[in-house]
Amino acid sequence: MKVADMQDQLVCHGCRNLLMYPRGASNVRCALCNTINMVPPPPPPHDMAHIICGGCRTMLMYTRGASSVRCSCCQTTNLVPAHSNQVAHAPSSQVAQINCGHCRTTLMYPYGASSVKCAVCQFVTNVNMSNGRVPLPTNRPNGTACPPSTSTSTPPSQTQTVVVENPMSVDESGKLVSNVVVGVTTDKK
């Protein structure tokens, strides 16, 4: 069993950092601000799914297969990511892209993550169907990676690699492990 299969993540209530924690933990202490965060309840049965409301951060439960969920607390209509309605999840080797909700830097993150922290401005962007992009295959037979093709042509741009380093977490054997994601920002000419 891989370490990634035994970990979950949440956003710290004190400093908004993305925290990784071992599955089954009831509380997680943030290494940066020392806030103790309660872990949300375990995932619902297969016929039900859950999503965090983008408006008020309340956990919402809904019937699997729904395309949107309306929050009864703040009345926000939340789009359900396509992968939330599937029983089988995308392989952990897939990555997806999203623009930072604050500085618009393009960030890459593991497919299925609920949020991404930007290394440039430290903003935590929640991932949902309306702002995430299709997962990119990380490996092709010749060992190279390529984004999916598009029908529109874009002018040449310069790219800059951005490293997103989340707070360290503890693996199943009690050792501290780093959580790093690579992002790409473009400076269009």
From Swiss-Prot:
User: What is the consequence of disrupting this locus?
Assistant: No visible phenotype under normal growth condition, however cold treatment induces the development of yellowish leaves with necrosis, and treatment with salicylic acid or infection with avirulent pathogen causes a runaway cell death and plant death.
GO biological process per UniProt: negative regulation of programmed cell death; plant-type hypersensitive response
- Annotated region described as LSD1-type zinc-finger, given as residue ranges: 9-39, 50-80, 97-127
Identify the Pfam families for this entry. Answer: zf-LSD1
Question: Per the entry, what induces it?
Answer: By methyl viologen.
Specify the domain of life of the species encoding this protein: Eukaryota
Q: Where is this region: Disordered?
A: 136-159
Q: Where's it found, cell-wise? A: Cytoplasm; Nucleus
| Key word Nucleus present | yes
Keywords, A to Z, come to: Apoptosis, Cytoplasm, Hypersensitive response, Nucleus, Plant defense
Q: Where is the composition biased (Low complexity)?
A: 147-159
What does UniProt give as GO cellular component?
Answer: cytoplasm; nucleus
Organ and tissue specificity: Expressed in cotyledons, roots, rosette leaves, stems, inflorescences and flowers.
Database matches in InterPro entries? LSD1-like, Znf_LSD1
Question: Its principal location?
Answer: cytoplasm
Role this protein plays: Negative regulator of reactive oxygen-induced cell death, cold stress-induced cell death, pathogen-induced hypersensitive response (HR), basal disease resistance. May be involved in the induction of the copper/zinc superoxide dismutase CSD1 and CSD2 that detoxify accumulating superoxide before the reactive oxygen species (ROS) can trigger a cell death cascade. LSD1 and LOL1 have antagonistic effects on CSD1 and CSD2 accumulation to regulate oxidative stress-induced cell death.
Its subunit composition reads: Interacts with BZIP10 and AMC1 (via N-terminus). Binds to BZIP63. Interacts with CAT1, CAT2 and CAT3 in a zinc-finger-dependent manner. Interacts (via N-terminus) with GILP.
Remarks, anything else? When expressed in Arabidopsis, Pisum sativa LSD1 interacts with importin alpha via the LSD1-type zinc finger motifs, suggesting that the nuclear import of LSD1 may rely on the interaction between its zinc finger motifs and importin alpha.
Q: Which PANTHER family match?
A: PROTEIN LSD1
Q: Which NCBIfam families match?
A: LSD1
The identity of this protein, by name, is Protein LSD1
Q: What is the lineage of its organism?
A: Eukaryota, Viridiplantae, Streptophyta, Embryophyta, Tracheophyta
Q: What is the primary gene name for this protein?
A: LSD1
